[in-house]
Amino acid sequence: SLKAGDVVHFKKGSAFSGNIRLRESGTAAKPIRLTSYGKGELPKFTNPSTRDASGNAITLGGEYIIVENLHFHDTPGERVSGMIIMTRLAALRIERGADHCIIRNNEFIKTGQGIMSAGEHTLITRNYLDGPSYALWRTSKSSWGPMGIHLNIGNQEVSYNTIKNFGTKDSPWGSDGGAIEIDCGRYHKKNIYIHHNYSEGNAGFIESSWDYDWPRFRQEIYNWRVSFNVCYDGQSWLFMLAP
């Protein structure tokens, strides 16, 4: 098992399929770190099945964990349906209570949902995300996704990321998806800082839900700062349903 201060090195050029879940925690002075070493392409991570940890390639269940210099790709989402999966589906997922984590300098390519975080005091920075063009699920009356970064709770910072092509026209609304989505009716939406991101080709930059939260608890937003972002997106720059 891992302990505070440990570093897990993945060799460049290697590939991993399935789920890796970290339950251990680091500390502020000695975080646990997942990173890469060697020469060549970044180590690749995927999980082709939603039956295995909801399609998460890496799941963080502990505090003070850093994930850096890894490549995530082709995690599922197409035609996936069901409310439970909506709160878990992502290439990299930070669970509720897994606070003070840092996700930096990673690549997410064709991941139905790149990063989902329910951890507070999280920093998501300097990642490159290039999404798929399909809906995560679709019916005749509704659709959902794809999304680059999905925040389930407040007290998080998203900065200096490049987020591209998370959007689909396979939707009864004409288009769906987006760069950053902030919803989950179970948790608060206070103190979110989104800055210096580059967003291109997505179905909108930021969406914050209200009646569409699941569970349907209405969480109002407080103390958001959105600044110095560059957006070349379709649909809308900001879709703010929650007051």
Describe the residue ranges of each PLM region:
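Parallel beta-helix/beta-solenoid
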Residues: K3, K11, E24, A29, ...
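Right-handed parallel beta-helix/beta-spiral solenoid domain characteristic of secreted/periplasmic
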Residues: H9-K12, F16, L22-M86
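Conserved SAM-binding loop
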Residues: G13, F108, S199
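Residues at the loop-to-beta-strand transition
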Residues: S14, I20, G26, S49, ...
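Extracellular beta-strand/beta-solenoid scaffold signature
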Residues: R21, N47-I58, V80-E95, I109-M116, ...
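Active-site/binding-pocket entry motifs
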Residues: K39-L42, H73, D130, K164, ...
